[in-house]
Amino acid sequence: MNALAATSRNFRQAARLLGLDSKLEKSLLIPFREIKVECTIPKDDGTLASFIGFRVQHDNARGPMKGGIRYHPEVDPDEVNALAQLMTWKTAVAAIPYGGAKGGIGCAPGELSTSELERLTRVFTQKIHDLIGAHTDVPAPDMGTNSQTMAWILDEYSKFHGHSPAVVTGKPIDLGGSLGRDAATGRGVMYATEALLAEHGKSISGSTFVIQGFGNVGSWAARIIHEKGGKVIALGDVTGSIRNKNGLDIPALMKHRNEGGALKDFHDAEVMDSSELLVHECDVLIPCALGGVLNRENAPDVKAKFIIEAANHPTDPEADEILAKKGVTILPDIYANSGGVIVSYFEWVQNIQGFMWDEEKVNMELHKYMNNSFQHIKAMCKSHDCNLRMGAFTLGVNRVARATLLRGWEA
């Protein structure tokens, strides 16, 4: 099942639990606007290249739409639509005043030079500048994009609308980015894990972890969990997978990786088959890479007691059912990986106020938002006698539905 079908399925289940009428249900599912633009740029060798860019603005009942822009060869309208819808529910679960959006350009960023990426970003911004804005739609980095991409968008947008730092989040600190933003998703994963384990009388300290993905989210999650006394016993990325039953030395591994080393070449670990990573014995499994990695083929062999969805849609619905029968507790993506969008909200607030926070305040506020969201999800689980995924979906959908009704948009 693709990401759009799975997200829509979860939404419909939540709508049924909430007893939404069919007209309201349909209006919540339909995107506010879908944008498709062609971006033609001169390449460094003088030839012209064309790329298709997308922006799906899903819902703005609770505030400006919010969502990342990804550069990836497999960006397509279905995927962007699913992720935009997911952002609507995610921002509502987090109780931040945003709706959902998502965008992307179908390209292979690794095959483009820095100057080509800049030209592509500026052309894309020129095509959508009148449809985004601090109080309309606020983009952020995603797969294949970063703070430099956001700096180019900010600059290009400002040529049309004047200096507007709040138009994007995930910017460089020197252009109004927030302290703590780089670590935010990984730190939020740690806070979410801490909250879930506490419910079961456990803690990060003394628990064993397997992490799939060692990019921004995975590396920060591993580092912060290690600092909290958790034992990361296996870890993998596109270069390979490694394990150490006594716990990997995460600071040493980070140093090795930052010096250009591949995971499989790390001295203090045993190389393992990557296909074994997700089914490795552990207390907590944290998928931080692509969607759909847990499926009906490998779900029966999963040995983790808890799964924290740091990636978007890492668990197929079929795997969800298998894991539930096995008694595995899954903390869903629309809550578990919301640390990034929460700190993006803090960045937006700081830009609008023109008053920057120190990192301690950012982390303290993030902790508060993650804890509050978890308690609200648990309350919905109790009210509707459902699992954590449906607890999160009913919480998010209910908040958006209430805002829609209050604004008189249901007709």
UniProtKB/Swiss-Prot annotation:
CDD domains recorded: NAD_bind_1_Glu_DH
Reactions catalysed, as given in the entry: L-glutamate + NAD(+) + H2O = 2-oxoglutarate + NH4(+) + NADH + H(+); L-glutamate + NADP(+) + H2O = 2-oxoglutarate + NH4(+) + NADPH + H(+)
UniProt keyword list: Mitochondrion, NAD, NADP, Oxidoreductase, Transit peptide
Gene Ontology MF, one: glutamate dehydrogenase (NADP+) activity
Predominant subcellular localization, coarse grouping: mitochondrion
GO biological process, one term: glutamate catabolic process
Tissues expressing the protein: Expressed in roots. Expressed ubiquitously in various tissues.
Pfam families reported for this sequence: ELFV_dehydrog (PF00208), ELFV_dehydrog_N (PF02812)
Induction (record text): Slightly induced by NH(4)Cl and NH(4)NO(3). Induced in shoots after nitrogen (N-deprivation) deprivation. In roots, first transiently repressed but later induced by N-deprivation. Induced by alkali stress. Up-regulated by salt stress in old leaves. Activated by IDD10 in the presence of NH(4)+ ions. Induced by cold stress (i.e. 10 degrees Celsius).
EC number in record: 1.4.1.3
Taxonomic superkingdom: Eukaryota
Cystine bridges: none
Family: Belongs to the Glu/Leu/Phe/Val dehydrogenases family.
Protein name stated in the entry: Glutamate dehydrogenase 2, mitochondrial
